[in-house]
Curated annotation (Swiss-Prot):
UniProt key word Disulfide bond: yes
Family: Belongs to the formicidae venom precursor-01 superfamily.
Source lineage: Eukaryota, Metazoa, Ecdysozoa, Arthropoda, Hexapoda
Organism of this sequence: Myrmecia gulosa (Red bulldog ant)
Removed propeptide positions: 24-47
Keyword annotations from UniProtKB, A to Z: Antimicrobial, Disulfide bond, Secreted, Signal
Predominant location category: secreted
Tagged with keyword Signal: yes
Tissue and organ distribution: Expressed by the venom gland.
Protein's name according to its UniProt entry: U-myrmeciitoxin(01)-Mg2a
Annotated signal sequence range: 1-23
GO terms for cellular component: extracellular region
Description of how the protein assembles with itself and partners: Homodimer; disulfide-linked.
Length: 84
């Protein structure tokens, strides 16, 4: 479990410290097919939710964004070292 947490922290650190890899922004890691559902999920009127529900909703969206960014960073690192 500690290893998984360390790997996640490392991936997030790389995504934050190195905003681009091979000239491509990490922000572009989220494809259009992933971005559209995320945008729709934010369209839900958060004002009608309780504070706890709104926080859970926003946290869920942030987790999806973080996962996509981490997957992209890992793919780029693997691609870089598999080119040999």
């Amino acid at each position: 479990m500690k290893t998984v947490i360390l790997l996640l922290v490392l991936a997030l650190t790389v995504a934050i410290i190195i905003p681009t890899i091979n000239g491509e922004s990490v922000a572009t890691a989220i494809s259009d097919s992933e971005a559209e559902p995320l945008a729709e999920s934010f369209a839900e009127p958060l004002a009608l939710l309780s504070k706890d529900q709104a926080l859970k909703h926003v946290w869920g969206v942030l987790k999806k964004l973080g996962k996509a960014a981490m997957e992209y960073v890992i793919q780029q690192i693997c691609a870089k070292y598999n080119k040999k």
